[in-house]
From Swiss-Prot:
The active site is at residues 796, 840. A dedicated protease for gasdermin bGSDM; cleaves the bGSDM precursor, releasing the pore-forming moiety, which integrates into the membrane and triggers cell death. Probably involved in defense against bacteriophages. Expression of bGSDM and this neighboring protease is highly toxic in E.coli. Cells expressing the gene pair stop dividing and lose membrane integrity. Both proteins are required to kill E.coli. SUPFAM superfamilies: L domain-like (SSF52058), P-loop containing nucleoside triphosphate hydrolases (SSF52540). This is Roc-COR-CHAT protease.
Length: 927
């Protein structure tokens, strides 16, 4: 057990030489303390200590600042008396399981208790000055705040097991609540009354009565949640269930999707003729009545309504279909015995359709459920390898063979649909809304059924106001209606934000009319004079809106006075000029899940100003960067789920590559945001007549400086020469300085040094002063680091030794013992803020440097590391450090955490992923 008096005997007293408070003086200095004029301890900093228990008695009553962060063995902190002057309490990253804050902490402003494994936190009295509380990443089951927390603004409680959190209505200054990844089932409605609230994180909870579209769609869900909570604050509120979802029929043309839709609605309905094929999309409601309590978990029987979205299977409409797919849907993939390439030239395999459904996550982060339906069973069967399908697509929940002409056989399908409802979403039967909100939805449905295709936002507001919705509720409900597909709203589009579409079929029909229109040229030029012919039953104002809608969907782009529609380009590839008869290199982007139909067409729209000499066709385009006179050919191989890129640049820098990659990533992000689709692609390079993954190419570039793909890793930029500088005084310096040292000037050993240097320099931009020496000799280490705050060393290493260059014209290098390195650093007569040793097995050296008092922090490695691991760590670490240059420990932890989440992170020789928190180790000065 330790007490304050015992601790200060071994610590350094910080002296106040000016108008700086004791708290500010000690803050940031470990193993130190400060006294007031009466000789009482006012500030104490002993982070990363070996304390097990700390008891604070009367000798601590003057404490204003207490820092014990990172004391991993500290299990107990006992306050024997109130600490009325304490303002800051840092107890994060310790081993405290429970803690009690007694009465009398009236000055306490900030409390940090994250990452302790804390199971109980008790405030026995008021904390009227408390502004911030961080209890993230613990094991707390509940939090309760009474009227003594009126100043509290920021609560961080992510990653606990919170089942309940209660607030007092007097807490009117709340601004930020981070409550993600808990087990909350409800939230106090009165929060909507707090005018200062701005941020609310709720992802990963269990608020099953509130639609996840409200609280789990955005990282900060306050805007929509505020409106919902406002609706609950009203007197005599009636909550009603919204038992509704989409059923989306997908598959190739002529497999019987429309027949299935008709038979679900009426088992006796006649089958449609071939001429009645669905043009793009049809939508009809399908209600299942009298679902039992056993099926729903509700106290009484209820009905459930599917809106059946019947997608036409014709290839030309696939680009439209994705506009209307969504999560919280049940997918029916329909095939048949004659659904093969032999019968249908536009046939695509089940992999495309199931990958499309698989890309849409449902509310729990799981993939949307799919029923695999083989139709026309009376006419023949096609063998299905169910095990293979399930292995590729785990969201296929059931397989069924039916015939639409055999009533008895068909009835098995609706029974299977009922069983699948609960798989759509965990809250599918529990979500409730204010009856006023659902009343608005009913009003909109009635308008649609009466033939109204759209209304103005002003009309929508009037309908909501008449139903009693407030301004916050109106904003939230419109967002939700758009997300669940009840309306289409382009709130971010200046020309469409006052327009709300009630009938998606009307939009679909308008787009289909463009697709079906016979243009007079191969470029599919949509001239203004064509619009009255294409949309003859639409008014002029409607045509203007629809044209803007096509632009918003990246369906067309403007060229002079006309609009170009890439989806309608000819299949014929144009002839290239002589200077494009060959290209320098080829890259493939392989989409991990699937390549959405129309991706290349949207890509052309976004980069249309770079299209070269009208070299554009249905499956490809040639781009030019005018400033550098460089070229890129981009083509789509849809069935391979791949985009192919060929580049041409005499200088080998290929500036178009970054723009192409960035644009395709932006298109992915748009779908991730609007549709919650999980889209990513892997990069491959064609090297020595083989396709190689990008990480493998990066290693090859390290070995071969002439590799044509070095531009992908920033290796084509000129190297900034190291300039020896005189020692720079630290006081008053605006920026921290970094010196990058390596010992491989001829790049003879693949340690990733040049890439590290380039990545670090690009990452930090002008946030730090950056210097480098790429041929550091063993006896120049000290002189190179004079006046530098951060020293980054990238060399080869073995335990207790690093290797620095001896002669840059040979392979010779000198082994430098840890003790010698320490002596070199001692010459600077300066304690560094940080030394980073990116070398194999460098932890021993890092520890010796810290133990020698030469730096406050040092980072080393525990094993042999690959160049990829070294590069990734360096880039991520400095990217985070530039925003928090004084929080080195936290930045290190966050770096390791984020890298461990990367599914493309480096692998060990045995194929296992790196655990960066074990491979890299940080040491901190403690004496």
């Amino acid at each position: 057990m330790s007490t304050l008096n015992n601790l200060t005997k071994t610590l350094t007293q910080q002296v106040d030489d000016g108008p700086i408070s004791a708290v500010r003086l000690v803050k940031g200095y470990d193993n130190s303390y400060a006294l007031n004029a009466a000789g009482q301890v006012t500030a104490l900093s002993i982070g990363n200590s070996s304390l097990k228990k700390l008891v604070l008695g009367t000798e601590a009553q003057a404490l204003e600042y207490l820092y014990l962060s990172g004391s991993e063995s500290l299990k107990e902190v006992v306050f024997e008396v109130p600490l009325p002057h304490l303002t800051h309490l840092y107890l994060n990253n310790c081993a405290i399981k429970d803690i009690t804050i007694p009465k009398g902490f009236r000055s306490l402003q900030q409390v940090y208790l994250q990452k302790n494994g804390l199971t109980e936190l008790v405030f026995e009295g008021d904390c009227p000055a408390l502004v911030l509380l961080d209890v993230s990443e613990n094991q707390l089951k509940g939090l309760s705040f009474h009227s003594g927390f009126r100043a509290l603004k920021y609560i961080y409680a992510t990653n606990n097991v919170l089942q309940k959190i209660t607030f007092n209505r007097s807490m009117r200054l709340l601004n930020t609540l981070h409550l993600a990844k808990n087990q909350l089932t409800e939230l106090a409605p009165f929060l909507s009354e707090i005018e200062t609230m701005e941020t609310l994180y709720l992802q990963g909870n269990q608020l099953l009565r509130i639609d996840r579209e409200i609280w789990d769609r955005d990282l900060n869900c306050w805007d929509t949640m505020k409106g919902y909570l406002t609706s609950l604050n009203k007197g005599n509120i009636i909550r009603e269930y919204l038992h509704e979802a989409k059923m989306i029929l997908i598959g190739n043309g002529e497999v019987g999707k429309t027949s299935i839709r008709l038979k679900l609605l009426d088992i006796n309905a006649p089958l449609p003729d071939k001429k009645d094929r669905t043009p793009g999309l049809d939508i009809v409601p399908y209600t299942i009545a009298n679902l039992s309590s056993a099926q729903t978990g509700l106290p009484a029987s209820t009905s459930f309504t599917f809106n059946i979205w019947d997608f036409g299977g014709q290839g030309k409409y696939r680009e439209i279909q994705q506009l209307f797919c969504s999560r919280k849907s049940l997918y029916l993939y329909v095939t048949a015995y004659d659904d093969t390439a032999d019968y249908n030239e536009l046939y695509v395999g089940y992999e495309y359709w199931l990958a499309m459904a698989n890309a849409y996550n449902n509310d729990s982060g799981q993939h949307s459920p799919v029923i695999y339906v083989q139709n026309k069973n009376d006419m023949g069967e096609k063998p299905i390898n169910e095990e293979e399908v399930k292995h590729k697509f785990g969201n296929v929940g059931a397989f069924i063979k039916i015939s639409c002409v055999d009533k008895e056989q068909f009835t098995a399908l609706p029974k299977l649909i009922v069983k699948s409802i609960s798989k759509i979403s965990e809250d599918i039967f529990t979500v409730q809304y204010n009856s006023e909100w659902l009343g608005v939805k009913e009003d909109l449905n009635e308008l649609k059924n009466q033939g109204t295709n759209y209304i103005s936002k002003e009309e929508f507001i009037t309908i909501c106001t008449e139903r009693g919705l407030s301004e916050d509720e109106i904003r939230a409900w419109l967002t939700v209606l758009d997300r669940i597909g009840a309306v289409i709203y382009f709130g971010d589009n200046e020309k469409l934000k006052d327009w709300i579409v009630l009938n998606p079929i009307w939009v679909k029909d308008a787009i289909c009319k463009v697709i079906d229109f016979e243009f007079y040229d191969d470029i599919a030029t949509l001239k203004p004079s064509f619009l009255p012919k294409i949309w003859e039953e639409y008014s002029e104002s409607e045509r203007e809106k629809l044209l803007q809608l096509l632009i918003s969907y990246h369906f067309c782009y403007k060229e002079e006075e006309s609009f170009i529609v890439p989806a309608l380009f000819t299949e014929n590839q144009p002839k290239y000029p002589e200077h494009l008869s060959s290209f320098d290199c080829e890259i493939k982007l392989k989409y991990v899940s699937f390549l959405p139909a129309g991706t290349l067409h949207k890509f052309m729209v976004k980069l249309h100003d770079k299209i070269y000499n009208e070299l554009r066709w249905k499956k490809g385009v040639v781009l030019q960067d005018g400033a550098t006179n460089t070229y890129a050919e981009v083509t789509e191989r849809w069935k391979e789920h791949s985009i192919y890129i060929r580049l041409k640049d005499k200088k080998g820098q290929h500036p178009l590559w970054q723009e192409i990659q960035k644009t395709l990533q932006e298109l992915n992000e748009e779908l991730k945001t609007t549709k919650l689709m999980q889209l990513d692609f892997e990069v491959y390079c064609f090297y020595n007549n083989k396709w190689k993954a990008k990480p493998d190419i990066e290693d090859l570039c390290e070995l071969d400086s002439t590799n044509i793909f070095k531009f992908m890793f920033g290796l084509s930029s000129p190297v900034k020469e190291y300039i020896s500088q005189k020692p720079t005084p630290l006081l008053g310096k605006a920026k921290l300085s970094i010196i990058f040292l390596t010992a491989d000037p001829e790049n003879k050993n693949p340690i990733g040094a040049s890439v590290q240097k380039q990545r670090i320099e690009n990452t930090i931009s002008d946030a730090f002063e950056f210097y480098n020496n790429l041929e550091t000799k063993y006896n120049e280490i000290g002189s190179n680091t004079v006046g530098k705050d951060i020293v980054h060393i990238t060399v080869h290493g073995i335990p207790d030794q690093l290797f620095f260059v001896h002669d840059k014209h040979t392979d010779q290098s000198n082994p430098v013992q840890s003790d010698y390195l320490c002596k070199q650093l001692e010459k600077t007569k300066q304690v560094k803020k940080l030394i980073v040793l990116i070398a194999c097995n460098s932890e021993t050296t890092a520890k010796k440097i810290v133990d020698g008092g030469l730096t406050k922090y040092a980072i080393g490695t525990t094993i042999d590391i690959s160049s990829k691991a070294a590069i990734d760590f360096s880039e991520k670490f400095y990217d985070l450090l530039k925003n928090s240059p004084l929080q080195i420990e936290s930045v290190f932890e966050e770096t390791c955490y984020e890298l461990n989440q990367d599914k493309y992170r480096a692998k060990l020789d045995d194929g296992e992923f790196y655990d960066y928190s074990k491979v890299f180790k940080i040491f901190k000065k403690t004496t």
